[in-house]
Amino acid sequence: MERRIFGLETEYGVTCTYRGQRRLSPDEVARYLFRRVVSWGRSSNVFLRNGARLYLDVGSHPEYATPECDSVADLVAHDRAGERILEGLLVDAEKRLHDEGIAGEIYLFKNNTDSAGNSYGCHENYLVSRHGEFGRLADVLIPFLVTRQLICGAGKVLQTPRGAVYCLSQRAEHIWEGVSSATTRSRPIINTRDEPHADAERYRRLHVIVGDSNMNEVTTLLKVGAADIVLRMIESGVVMRDLTLENPIRAIREVSHDITGRRKVRLASGKEISALEIQQEYLAKATEFVERRGGDQTAKRVVELWGRVLSAVETGDLEPVAREIDWVTKLRLIERYQRKHDLPLSHPRVAQMDLAYHDLRRGRGLYGLLERRGQVDRAATDPEIFEAKETPPQTTRARLRGEFIRHAQEKRRDFTVDWVHLKLNDQAQRTVLCKDPFRAYDERVERLIASM
């Protein structure tokens, strides 16, 4: 299969609990968190030696954007590396707070909603050819993305006027459009703002903002891997039945509120079909496509897992995928906790548990606890994640950026970088423009590094 560039941008929730008198606003907490970054990067928006971008987003949300990866497996490791980097900042910030006599603990959550009903996202990026029909791509993808939460939602206890319900997705309640160029005001499923971060004549960046942030590496692998296969099918001209939804925004909420996958949603044709049936159609085509095209090991693992998740949902026996899929893992935890303490789903302690699942601090977060006990499956190893904290992917443009940053820092040279530019801030203001995200070696960059 042809290479594709992938990237994940994850916004994290941040809060602080206090034992003393002094209280900090979210802005102040975020500043403490980024103080170490600002001290060496002179900014709260920096690129790292591993090629990634780390910055404070609107509303004091720390955001980590992975470097460009050309395999889903690499992407999973770099996404987890982002968690470790932020966890390091958290430990540092807490120590500084305590040194200044502020008694409290900082929490970073890899989730998508806070208690005030605000939402922050996990944005997926897929490089696609400029020459395809972008409109058709979006049309075929939307029914897939609306129902994809069935296989990769993060799970959420939602308080409604009719009582608490367990939902598949955290993000579903906050999506208001199908396709749009805005990301915050209207929150579409697919964002169409045209910023390829590459040669604009050849490429376009498909920016999917409907997905949940996942704790489980296997769920992340499935989320991105399944979307990649569906994209490849569309690009290859695979004929798909028209599954256009009458109202994608209503459908995404209806799907989220039904963990059996059986609730019918209405198609534009007037026909009614369940989320499970829609996913089964995409899976059948994907399985045939991967077999015919001779997909790599990751693609084979993705369709196998996709099939197992849909079978588990169809039979109602979720146990076979409880170690791999976030919403199932969390549901099992909550159900056990409810039984043990005889609590209704609406109890505040259940909501607390829901949140604790996403706590990044490994000695404290629930997911981290499951991982340490070997109760969840993995798609990356600890050595791979450790390496991804420092080392960029070696087969994409991220390698050039990472090498440039490393050398400039070691030589104490002033520099500026973004996704496509590498610039030495000397008298000559030498800049190299790297428009090809697949290119990991470039003589111009080597010369720039050698000149330091």
Swiss-Prot record:
Biological process annotations from GO: modification-dependent protein catabolic process; proteasomal protein catabolic process; protein pupylation
Keyword Transcription regulation recorded: no
Catalytic activity as recorded in UniProt: ATP + [prokaryotic ubiquitin-like protein]-L-glutamate + [protein]-L-lysine = ADP + phosphate + N(6)-([prokaryotic ubiquitin-like protein]-gamma-L-glutamyl)-[protein]-L-lysine
Domain of life: Bacteria
Binding-site residues, Mg(2+): E9, Y55, E63
Pathway where this protein functions: Protein degradation; proteasomal Pup-dependent pathway; Protein modification; protein pupylation
InterPro entries on file: Pup_ligase (IPR022279), Pup_ligase/deamidase (IPR004347)
Residues the record marks as active site: D57
HAMAP family (alphabetical): Pup_ligase
Biological function: Catalyzes the covalent attachment of the prokaryotic ubiquitin-like protein modifier Pup to the proteasomal substrate proteins, thereby targeting them for proteasomal degradation. This tagging system is termed pupylation. The ligation reaction involves the side-chain carboxylate of the C-terminal glutamate of Pup and the side-chain amino group of a substrate lysine.
UniProt protein name: Pup--protein ligase
Species in which this protein is naturally found: Salinispora tropica (strain ATCC BAA-916 / DSM 44818 / JCM 13857 / NBRC 105044 / CNB-440)
